Amino acid sequence: MAGHSKWANIQHRKGRQDEKRGAAFSKIAKEITVASKMGGGDINFNPRLRVAVDKAKGVNMPKDKIDTAIKKGTGELEGVEYIEIRYEGYGIGGAAIMVDCLTDNKVRTVAEVRHAFSKFGGNMGSDGCVAFQFKHCGQMIFAPGTDEGALMDAAIEAGADDVTTNDDGSIEVLTPPNDYMAVKDALEAAGFKPEFGEVTMKPEGENVFAGEEGVKMQKLLDALENLDDVQEIYTTAVIED
């Protein structure tokens, strides 16, 4: 058994995604465009695109928006040229934060990210300053009550790296990043549908915040998340109710 309430954290995150559905569509469309530009528009031959499209379907993004984003990447439609950038830094209490961005203006983006860090008690660091605190992997979370033994057998057979039952009864399955969709497909075919899944940078440790400190930390994360150029935020911070 391991971890804080992963299930509660996932439900909270899904709720926030629902509240910001329009922004989520925009961010995922960017990722689809970049993925299709880099690897082509066929999800069968482009793992990154397949993950992005799977994510789009997970938030009920309309098919026409997905198709438009792909065509912008392949050049069938005119689109914006995006640059991928990752910024690293610290929140209050030294919590590690990584910020992945897609931007058409690097100068604007770095200024906005730095401002968000400094305004809410954090600070930007140099490249690599916190990356060692995260593991690049595929992650799936299954609901409490899932048959742990059967899921573990199916996950191992499908090529998962690790299966962990959390304190709250939810089950976490980790995969190599490039094998995420193959493992997910195999588990769904075996009758196990994750409540949440993504290719992510999973924190190796936790900085737990509560009360006023938790509120401060959430404000920093919200400020970063609300920036148009920010795609994903990864952090060691765990904010308890």
From Swiss-Prot:
Top-level taxon of origin: Bacteria
Location, primary (coarse class): cytoplasm
Subcellular location: Cytoplasm
The keyword Membrane appears for this protein: no
InterPro entries: Integrase-like_N, TACO1_YebC-like_2nd/3rd_dom, TACO1_YebC_N, Transcrip_reg_TACO1-like, Transcrip_reg_TACO1-like_dom3, YebC-like
Keyword annotations of the record: Cytoplasm, DNA-binding, Transcription, Transcription regulation
Gene Ontology process terms (BP): regulation of DNA-templated transcription
One GO CC term on file: cytosol
Region (Disordered): 1-22
Family to which the UniProt record says this protein belongs: Belongs to the TACO1 family.
Name recorded for this polypeptide: Probable transcriptional regulatory protein Daro_4067
